[in-house]
């Protein structure tokens, strides 16, 4: 279910979770005219937990998946590379709510699969890697990294991970669990998890990939890390109160644009993947005020392509840039 959460959040819910002081200087803290402490949201776990606890009371309303696409702000110490790492950025955040850990990990697997399919559709080879949970917390996390020499993350991986086709799996629990196991049993980590001895032990020398990558997605399972301290409770099947189990799933939309450029660019041309390209074909005839023959040819090609339902743009401007 889509929603839209505000960018400005109350500090009170962050104090409830215990993260207000822990988050550090990346959080932009402000006060309103009454002196009330506010913040520009760097992430939304507290806010979505507050929304959920005010409206959902029973297991009968589960599972739930809520998401929004919204701006975030983090006071990055070294913003650089344009949209790749900036202080304000556009992001898709989704949050799952389940009755117990077993069902919650099924939701996690579904999002794991959905992310792989999404990046695959964008013609991107995104590698899911076991990741540190950082300030989000929890005990299960994967980041999705695409290889690019301009990336910030150091990547250590077994090249066999590229041989796994996400399309071979079905959108059902047993298949999704196998999918996550198949991907995660092959060595692939960033520098945060890298251990040289393990890399050499588990990956043959000829299969080792050591390069740079760009993180374009990150998913977390953190159980009741937020629901318990924030008293986000539901009635279970026996009528007892229990803390809801949660996960979060993010894709950096603005960063993804830059990442696609880095992954698809060569020294001669930048080629957008078809699902996000503005047009399939652009016709640029060499025209002038005194000669319309090329424009007429361009119009003929344009009409033929339109008949074939090809998304085409005809540039009929007769002025040089």
Which residues are covered by each model-predicted region?
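NTP/phosphate- and nucleic-acid-binding module
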Residues: 1-321
């Amino acid at each position: 279910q889509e929603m839209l959460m505000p960018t400005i959040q109350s500090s009170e819910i962050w104090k409830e979770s215990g993260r207000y002081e822990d988050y550090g200087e990346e959080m932009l803290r402000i006060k309103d005219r009454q002196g009330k402490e506010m913040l520009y949201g760097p992430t939304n776990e507290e806010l979505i937990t507050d929304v959920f606890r005010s409206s959902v009371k029973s297991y009968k309303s589960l599972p739930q998946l809520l998401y929004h696409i919204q701006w975030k702000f983090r006071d990055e110490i070294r913003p650089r590379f344009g949209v790749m790492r900036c202080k304000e950025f556009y992001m898709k955040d989704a949050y799952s709510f389940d009755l117990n850990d077993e069902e919650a990990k099924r939701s996690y697997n579904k999002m794991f699969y959905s992310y792989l399919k999404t990046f695959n559709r964008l013609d991107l080879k995104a590698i899911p890697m076991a990741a540190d949970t950082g300030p989000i917390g929890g005990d299960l996390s994967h980041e999705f990294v695409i290889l690019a020499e301009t990336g910030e993350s150091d990547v250590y991986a077994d090249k066999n991970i590229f041989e796994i086709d996400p399309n071979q799996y079905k959108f059902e629990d047993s298949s999704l669990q196998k999918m996550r196991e198949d991907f995660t049993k092959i060595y692939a980590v960033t520098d945060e998890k890298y251990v040289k001895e393990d890399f050499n032990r588990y990956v043959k020398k000829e299969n080792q990939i050591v390069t740079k990558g760009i993180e374009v997605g990150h998913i977390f399972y953190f159980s009741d890390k937020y629901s318990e301290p924030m008293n986000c409770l539901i009635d279970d099947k026996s009528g007892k109160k229990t803390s809801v189990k949660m996960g979060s799933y993010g894709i950096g939309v603005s960063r993804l644009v830059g990442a696609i450029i880095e992954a698809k660019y060569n020294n001669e041309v930048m080629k957008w993947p078809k699902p996000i390209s503005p047009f399939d074909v652009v016709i640029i005839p060499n025209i002038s005020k005194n000669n319309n023959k090329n424009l007429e040819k361009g119009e003929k090609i344009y009409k033929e392509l339109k008949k074939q339902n090809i998304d085409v743009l005809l540039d009929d401007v007769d002025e040089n840039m």
